[in-house]
Amino acid sequence: MTAQLSKKSEAWSARFNEPVSDLVKRYTASVFFDKRLAQVDIQGSLAHAEMLAHQKIISQQDHAEIQRGMAQIQEEIASGKFEWLLDLEDVHLNIEKRLTELVGDAGKRLHTGRSRNDQVATDIRLYVRSEIDNIVGLLRDLRLALLDLAEKHADTILPGFTHMQVAQPITFGHHMLAYVEMFSRDAERMLDCRKRVNRLPLGAAALAGTTFPIDRERVARTLDFEDVCHNSLDAVSDRDFAIEFCAAAALIMTHVSRMSEELVIWMSPRVGFIDIADRFCTGSSIMPQKKNPDVPELARGKTGRVNGHLIALLTLMKGQPLAYNKDNQEDKEPLFDTVDTVVDTLRIFADMATGITVKPDAMRAAALQGYATATDLADYLVKKGLPFRDAHEAVAHAVRACVDRGCDLSDLTLEEMRVFSPLIEADIFEVLTLEGSVAARNHIGGTAPQQVRLAIARHRSKLN
């Protein structure tokens, strides 16, 4: 029986009296998605092997053999020659099996003092840390593209909306800066998340630590972790760092989705504020005239996908007792797809920002149609000494009269305006222009072109 059992392919098969069914193998295997972790798995294994040799847990010769074997495995993976086997379950055992084929007993000694539990936790942290750095860089690229667009249109009038109704005039540059602010916070969130990702689980072993005289701090230094995880149970069992990453990613996509909604609306022929370059649009298989903003529409849709992954991970963790459970195998596909979706979306949006054509005349015409300067008239009366609530009421009556007549506030004569307040004088016509309205909001965070340019300069300084 012993000889028969020793032929089984699983690393743990000696405990069992019968082989695992093929159905169970397919159901429990993760290698065809977690092989994405191959490079970080090798990176972690090399650091672990170096520590084992330094601590004299394995010999220097074994260490050299492990390094040699891992170098060949990396080449095989890069060239597509590495054979991934479902029978070996996951990325870890596939690599370990190949290493043993290449270097013999030295490969069998690599797993001394560790478990797949702390191994995979380390792999995921290395992976997430790397992707955070990548995403922060892509957020920078997107912000720079939006800053270019904002700078080009720092003076371009755009109607600002609340409740999808014209509210007050702003500039297109100011509007773009709102998204720059959102994506700046997204980058800050990612970097803050990185602090909690950047802790080393390796050395926790299965759940209780190891009896070998390991040096966890040495491995942490080798892998550029700021610290080690200080409780072995927590180190192998929790995925809160991945959940936090997915939450930050969901916020990125939420901001992208809000921008997408506006781009779709603005590109509509009924609105016509912008056009998006043909290379970011598609047509219809039946309607020859169509030019559809598929990229922002799809980004809007993919946001729900990323939100779903966040909920999946939260649900995955909520019922697990300590320590590691097989449930955690399900953390990878939502995590990987979140990364892919966010990375692809940020890349294409930074590119698409260069293909947005703004139509100032359409924006200006829309700003003239919704009594956008009504608040300016109320502020004018307040500055003349009228309490704000009284000023608000007077202007509301004026707007009502304009609605009935089908004209704008600026179309009223001075005499007609004075019907609503005797405080109104000839200087009111400077106040009621769109340019005058935006220029008057000349403070930090305001829409005045001067402030827009100062804000752009501040952001560029931070990004550079």
Swiss-Prot record:
Q: What is its EC number?
A: 4.3.2.1
Location comes to:
Cytoplasm
Which key words are in the record? Amino-acid biosynthesis, Arginine biosynthesis, Cytoplasm, Lyase
User: Which Gene3D superfamilies does the entry link to?
Assistant: Fumarase/aspartase (C-terminal domain) (1.10.40.30), Fumarase/aspartase (Central domain) (1.20.200.10), Fumarase/aspartase (N-terminal domain) (1.10.275.10)
Q: Which GO terms describe its biological process?
A: arginine biosynthetic process via ornithine; L-arginine biosynthetic process
Listed under catalytic activity are: 2-(N(omega)-L-arginino)succinate = fumarate + L-arginine
Matching InterPro entries: Arg_succ_lyase_C, Argininosuccinate_lyase, Fumarase/histidase_N, Fumarate_lyase_CS, Fumarate_lyase_fam, Fumarate_lyase_N, L-Aspartase-like
This protein's GO CC annotations: cytosol
What Pfam families does this protein's entry cite? ASL_C2, Lyase_1
Q: In which pathway does it act?
A: Amino-acid biosynthesis; L-arginine biosynthesis; L-arginine from L-ornithine and carbamoyl phosphate: step 3/3
SUPFAM superfamilies reported in the protein's UniProt record: L-aspartase-like (SSF48557)
Indicate the family of this protein. Belongs to the lyase 1 family. Argininosuccinate lyase subfamily.
Q: What is this protein called?
A: Argininosuccinate lyase
